[in-house]
């Protein structure tokens, strides 16, 4: 549960043990409240002075501690009471697929995992702009760009493991799906090797969702009954070009702008039709989303101004999107014409 209320300057009493109440304390502090603590119904020396009349009392569910008398006193005094969930088991890692970056494409599992985190290590392709609205955890940017890794993969794994071993609930938020060119397998292995409990929450992969944002289906009846997802981080070999060219279906390339010239030339050498349509979808589901369409013979020139993050789609399905777009534009033009005739 995240707070959308402004509690600036308000006194809020949060009950429960230090471990149980830690996330609730952060939430109310971020909402601007003056947070006071009551660890047990009788109080502990470390709790400090309590407010004479708090604006709100937050009761943290920590295994049946007897807070009922306090709740009843608050109700009698007209003091609002909020019931807060305790954090989950301490010291674990959750790998979360954040989808292509749009908040509404986060899974229910992702949204449920974020509030339970003490620290979130997030990538640049995850929906990071809205994170503060989804969790009160500490947010650590470990995002990588092609050719620029501010934090190395091994350092990311080390940070995750160290935080979990300190008893923190760690969320590793990644763009797309952790297991589709997301190095999720390596991060799971690092946790397992360190004895840290770990689970994976799948995400909406950009290999399907970003083409969809541009109206391109990766499969379409009687056009393509298969699709292949390829990493564009490194140039492919001639053998791989030949394999791809002979598969048929749709080819989806993630983060492939840097290697697009080699890929297009290699596929042509391998016998792919130079008139095969190619789409470059930049910044899918983000401000400035743009689609560039050309054929395999001219895509290097057409995509000169394109940049990552981008998804390449190679195949006849690109024509499906163009046909639908042309039909929609023609229908809109007919509607405008009909409206003008009625007004005449």
Regions found by a protein language model. Give the residues of each.
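Flexible N-terminal pre-Rossmann segment of NAD(P)-dependent oxidoreductases
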Residues: 3-9
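Class I S-adenosyl-L-methionine
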Residues: 10-71, 78, 83-103, 108-201, ...
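Short alpha-helices
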Residues: 63, 205-209, 310
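A contiguous loop/helix-start segment that scaffolds small-molecule binding in enzyme catalytic cores
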Residues: 92-95, 155, 165-170, 226, ...
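Short, hinge-like loop/turn segments at secondary-structure boundaries
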Residues: 138-141, 158, 215-221, 270, ...
């Amino acid at each position: 549960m995240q707070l959308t209320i402004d509690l600036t300057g308000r006194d809020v009493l949060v009950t429960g043990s230090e471990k149980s109440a830690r996330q609730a304390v952060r939430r109310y502090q971020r909402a601007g409240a003056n947070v006071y603590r009551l660890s047990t119904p009788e109080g502990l020396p470390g709790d400090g002075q309590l407010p004479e009349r708090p604006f709100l009392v937050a009761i943290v569910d920590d295994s049946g501690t007897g807070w009922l008398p306090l709740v009843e006193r608050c109700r009698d005094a007209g003091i609002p009471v909020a019931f807060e969930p305790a954090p989950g088991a301490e010291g674990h890692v959750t790998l979360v697929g954040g989808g292509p970056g749009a908040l509404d494409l986060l899974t229910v599992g992702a949204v449920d995992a974020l509030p339970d985190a003490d620290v979130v290590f997030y990538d640049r392709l995850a929906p990071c702009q809205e994170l503060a609205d989804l969790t009160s955890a500490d947010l650590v940017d470990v995002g990588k760009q092609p050719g620029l890794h501010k934090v190395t993969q091994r350092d990311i794994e080390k940070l995750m493991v160290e935080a979990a071993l300190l008893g923190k609930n760690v969320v590793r938020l990644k763009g797309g799906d952790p297991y589709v060119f997301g190095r999720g397998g390596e991060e799971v292995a690092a946790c397992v090797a360190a004895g840290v409990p770990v689970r994976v929450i799948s995400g909406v992969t950009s290999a399907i969702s970003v083409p969809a944002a541009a109206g391109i289906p990766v499969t379409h009846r009687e056009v393509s009954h298969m699709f292949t997802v390829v990493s564009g981080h490194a140039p492919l070999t001639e053998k791989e070009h030949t394999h791809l060219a002979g598969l048929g279906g749709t080819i989806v390339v993630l983060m492939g702008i840097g290697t697009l010239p080699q890929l297009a030339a290699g596929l042509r050498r391998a016998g792919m039709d130079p008139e095969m349509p190619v789409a470059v979808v930049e910044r899918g589901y983000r401000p400035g989303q743009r689609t560039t369409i050309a054929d395999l013979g001219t895509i290097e020139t057409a995509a000169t101004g394109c940049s990552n993050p981008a998804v390449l789609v190679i195949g006849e399905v690109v024509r499906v999107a163009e046909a639908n777009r042309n039909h929609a534009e023609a229908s809109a033009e007919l509607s405008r014409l009909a409206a003008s005739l009625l007004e005449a």
